[in-house]
């Protein structure tokens, strides 16, 4: 499991980020039934929590960083 915290200026509209949505769908498709992707907003600070679970730690880390970059971008 890999967790990346992505600090943003504001969480407003993060769910509507098409780049993040596309990358999330691609990551989940890559993992298939062998892993999962979870992205949620922190309840206490302007941070997105990006979590990727997979048996392959390197793959989880790579996908989580890619999702974090999409969230920033």
Regions found by a protein language model. Name each.
Residues 1-73:
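Phosphate-binding and adjacent anionic-ligand microenvironments
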């Amino acid at each position: 499991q890999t967790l990346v915290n992505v600090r943003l200026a504001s969480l407003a509209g993060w769910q509507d980020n098409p780049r993040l949505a596309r990358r999330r769908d691609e990551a989940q498709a890559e993992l298939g039934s062998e892993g999962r992707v979870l992205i949620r907003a922190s309840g206490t600070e302007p941070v997105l929590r990006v979590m990727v679970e997979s048996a392959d730690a390197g793959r989880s880390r790579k996908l989580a960083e890619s999702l974090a970059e999409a969230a920033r971008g």
